[in-house]
């Protein structure tokens, strides 16, 4: 009987090991494919010209492949979305975890879950039909499809991730911490923000980094509201193009060096995501220490 149990445990262990190796293999395959496909264009164009060139004209008679506008747009767009989405998401999470009644928490929790379930094209469609014309009318600009529209859409899209993960982190704080703070004379608000929030810091940091990853990797929604012009993002009302949308809009008809350059853009985006994951691990390890 014991031998059969050990055999079963070994089989289960082997299955999980294989599944884990498959996951690792997928990451390695994607990494190798992007590197192999993206490096040739960087070699031909030149790393400096590719990363810091301000003009992208892939279909011109004399093509130019500078992706600095895409890089800056992705950075500005993500930073703007985080600047708007993190405070709203964080304060909402504190309210749901510490202040809201069970009924309010259930209703708002369901609303957050529904917001998370809306597909990217849904956000993009609402932004294109409502937000873009609204920006055009309110700010009296020729076209509302802009960096500002992209930031607002991305800020809304990252809210569910930030709220859910932050609520989970705050609810995981031992109740004894709060009881001790209250016993020492602290108010509930002081306890929430000076005891519970620092104790849940690693989870909240993970939520923010996840939001950054969601924002920088989004393509469909921003493609519908950004304008998709390869301009330097010198204004919130400028029609712009992100790293993701640059690949998505041109890949279908690309060929030759243009296609290789798009893979190079994907490689740059992949490195951005890896950097974000490294930052997440740094925060988590620092919190554990």
Identify the function of each model-found stretch.
Residues 1-68, 72-75, 263-289:
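N-terminal, non-cleaved signal-anchor transmembrane helix
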Residues 13, 88-127:
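Cytoplasmic-entry segments and transmembrane alpha-helices of multi-pass inner-membrane transporters
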Residues 67-95:
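Transmembrane alpha-helix signature in integral membrane proteins
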Residues 113-155:
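Generic hydrophobic transmembrane alpha-helix motif, especially the helices
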Residues 119, 184-185, 198:
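Glycine/proline-centered hinge or cleavage motifs at structural transition points of membrane proteins
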Residues 165-166, 188-224:
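Transmembrane alpha-helices
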Residues 167-171, 175, 182, 249-289:
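C-terminal transmembrane helix and the adjacent membrane-cytosol boundary/short C-terminal tail
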Residues 222-270:
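Interhelical loop and adjacent transmembrane-helix boundary motif
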